[in-house]
Amino acid sequence: MTAQFEHVSVLMDETIDALAIKPDGIYMDGTFGRGGHSGQILARLGSEGRLQAIDQDPQAIKSAEKFADDPRFAIAHTRFSNLYGVAEQNDLIGKVDGILLDIGVSSPQLDDALRGFSFMKDGPLDMRMDPTTGRSAAQWLAEAELDDITHVIKKLGEEKFGKRIAHKVLEVREHTPITTTKQLADLVDEAVPVKDKFKHPATRTFQAIRIYINSELEEIQTALQSAIKVLKPGGRLVVISFHSLEDRIVKQFIRKQSRGETLPRGLPLTDAQINQNLTLKAVGKAIKPSAAEVERNPRSRSSVLRIAQRLG
């Protein structure tokens, strides 16, 4: 692996502290990436400890070969939303001491032009976390209706010029297939009338299409629900997210599972409402990277770490 494609795991110390690793514990890293967090977990496990990793990216699976000789380690090539399935196959339901989810695109994925995630590097417009399955971004843009493109860019990218961009996509694709990241970045640049001097005009559009192509928000929701069933009482759920849509889902999930539904005041309550089945306890407040970490690794700037503990 070249230095260009190396990945610096964010909030490393904070994440390891949050997992409260026991030497003989069982842990799951739902987003192995290049193994930064997994390596630190393994370093703290004793001979009886166990780490089950997951990743859908074939390059991540290849990277995991460095741990192939460690009997405490195993990895499954699948989406992290399949957390429950992996745990079930390995007889881990209700036995796991800690689950880590480091959500979003990794530095190697961004830095490799051939993956099609970055508007800063020209390459094929792919954006799939697992390029062996599903539709690429180019295939979707070639077929999608105006309203669908508008909806994705506005909702998942929080881009106020979503409709303008969608119209531009349809205008361009009538005479030229949109197959590269540069083509998409250039047409977004043309479509956006007001530029943010601190942010590339294509930032939100690329984010939106990537999230849509990989069903990222649905992935998070499914994985969070699965984590409750997989964790043992006292087990930790540790989630790192990188933008507001992801963090909102995590925050609201932990809040609901730790506080229950908001009940109406002044009305008689049913037994079910009174005895809500709370499954998690929030641990501390959201953690953000230090100024020193942001200086070392600017991509960590938007990261947020949230911690919850499984109730018994």
From Swiss-Prot:
Gene Ontology terms describing biological process: rRNA base methylation
Binding residues for S-adenosyl-L-methionine: 35-37, 55, 80, 102, 109
EC number(s) per entry: 2.1.1.199
GO molecular function, one term: rRNA (cytosine-N4-)-methyltransferase activity
Catalytic activity: cytidine(1402) in 16S rRNA + S-adenosyl-L-methionine = N(4)-methylcytidine(1402) in 16S rRNA + S-adenosyl-L-homocysteine + H(+)
Keywords of this entry: Cytoplasm, Methyltransferase, rRNA processing, S-adenosyl-L-methionine, Transferase
Primary location recorded for the protein, binned into one broad class: cytoplasm
Gene3D superfamilies: Putative methyltransferase TM0872, insert domain, Vaccinia Virus protein VP39
rRNA processing recorded as keyword: yes
Residues that span the membrane, as ranges: none
Matches recorded under InterPro entries: RsmH, SAM-dep_MeTrfase_MraW_recog, SAM-dependent_MTases_sf
Domain of life: Bacteria
Enzyme class: transferase
Localization terms from the record: Cytoplasm
GO cellular component annotations of the record: cytoplasm
Membership in a protein family: Belongs to the methyltransferase superfamily. RsmH family.
Function description: Specifically methylates the N4 position of cytidine in position 1402 (C1402) of 16S rRNA.
Name assigned to this protein: Ribosomal RNA small subunit methyltransferase H
Gene encoding the protein: rsmH
